[in-house]
A protein has these predicted regions:
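Beta-strand-rich domain onsets/edges
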Residues: 92-119
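A short, amphipathic beta-strand motif
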Residues: 118-130, 211-217
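Trp- and acidic/polar-enriched beta-sheet ligand-binding modules for extracellular glycan
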Residues: 225-250
Length: 250
């Protein structure tokens, strides 16, 4: 707290401590992976007298309706203290990815996606390897050079159905062999408005491109916090003695 630093997860934990100390019910919702970045995201929620979800997240101190969250998210979960027994029964004792082995969460995607909430239905035609009926298949989002599972379903005869999802993401399907994810499809775009997917199949021809930004600049919180910041240099790895190299004025 004194350093005013930390991740969104740590900030959400702090808000929970403060709210509960004041007698106000509060918890944490999260995306296992953002659709527009390479990291998960956590924030706080509370419920009004009608059971509607209101949220707050850094740096906005105001509370707003959950449906107003614009971030591409695919899936949203709510941290719980007890096991989600519905998911436990669905697993039927099968080998699961560690992220879903002990489901201490509730799926609240529909609360956030509202009218855009839909089941993602994928034909088995896009699977590039053999998957058997009853196998667990994961819907994954990317994180830098890897993939992270954010939802799972059981493979039926000729299709996969991931319940309660929102689009505007790039995903991929995978299975889990007990040690690592095994990719089972080409990456694909998942459109939020239509619910359709489009495979991103590698082409034989290559094209050179120039990238000017490492991350998108839209609503970049780092930019807003730069003024007043400094770049420092030091010969000491602990920075006990440091020189200011540059001061950010604007």
């Amino acid at each position: 707290v004194s350093w005013r630093a930390g991740s969104c997860h740590e900030f959400a934990d702090l808000v929970v401590y403060v709210m509960r100390a004041l007698g106000i019910p509060c918890g944490t919702d999260y995306m296992a992976m953002r659709g527009d970045n390479n990291v998960p995201h956590f924030w706080n929620f509370t419920l009004d007298k009608d059971g509607k979800t209101y949220i707050t997240e850094f740096p906005d101190p105001n509370w707003k309706r959950a449906v107003s969250m614009y971030n591409p998210k695919a899936k949203v979960y709510r941290n719980t203290y007890g096991l989600n027994w519905k998911d436990v029964k669905r697993q039927q004792g099968k080998m699961m990815h560690p992220a879903f082995r002990k489901p201490l969460y509730q799926d609240v995607t529909a609360v956030y996606a509202d009218s855009l909430n839909r089941d993602l239905v994928v034909s088995s035609d896009i699977l590039c390897k053999e998957v058997h009926k009853g196998d667990i298949v994961y819907f994954c989002l990317s994180t830098r050079m890897d993939w992270v599972p954010i939802a799972w379903t059981v493979f039926e005869e000729d299709s996969l159905r991931f319940q309660d999802t929102e689009g505007s993401v790039i995903g991929c399907l995978a299975t889990w062999n007990g040690k690592r994810l095994v990719m089972q499809s080409e990456p694909f775009t998942y459109d939020k408005m239509s619910g359709t997917i489009a495979l991103l199949t590698p082409q034989s021809e290559k094209e050179d491109i120039t990238l000017y930004f490492k991350f998108p600049l839209f609503c970049d919180l780092g930019i807003l916090r730069m003024p007043g910041g400094v770049f420092e240099g030091s010969n000491d790895s602990q920075f006990r003695s440091a020189d200011t190299l540059y001061y950010v004025k604007q």
